[in-house]
Amino acid sequence: MIYASKGNFEMACWLILASMILDGLDGRVARLTNTASKFGVEFDSLADVVAFGVAPAMLLYFYIGIDYGRLGACVPAIFVIFGAVRLARFNITTSSEPNFFIGLPIPSAAVVVMLWVLIDLEYKLIENYNYGYVMLLGSFIISILMVSNIRYPSFKKMQWNFKSFIAVILLLGIVYVNPRETLCVLMSGYVVYGILRWLVLIIKVRFSSKLTKDKNT
């Protein structure tokens, strides 16, 4: 948040990514050391609101929102509010690690926003193509996805075998060569996958109900 307010946007972005990595480790460390507690769960949620709600919202505001008046202030505010709602819903509906998430996870939402900023820092899309409104609109859509009922896959219980291990190694190699572009494609693809899967399910349900109705008539 401090780096974003001072205009050091690249460092602010990488710190958000570091927060996501550490967030994936803290629960496992607590279980391995047998130090998991209800207090830890609630405190972790508070940390998530700050790291993945407030921090990316401030990054978004100081990077682009500050130039768009009330609209530029509203979108980051909505991001924080919907992110907090997403975490609250997760805490009351999840008793164990699920195979999927209901709504886009707030860490993923935060990383998508910060990757858009990183890409713009590299290619100057806002400066050259007036990309600002697109970024604000995209961030608003990301906020909506956090509180939606769209299911996103969870990789916490992924079955590790030789093929998956090799795939992860190759993926890490690609990320190492082109970290910004690769991560942006992967995370944006994750967001789009949930939407496409939701649309396919809706089409299947409607088609199935139509077939059933036709058979009954």
Feature map (PLM): residue ranges:
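Hydrophobic transmembrane-helix microenvironments that flank and shape a buried ionizable site
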Residues: 20-23, 41, 45, 80-83, ...
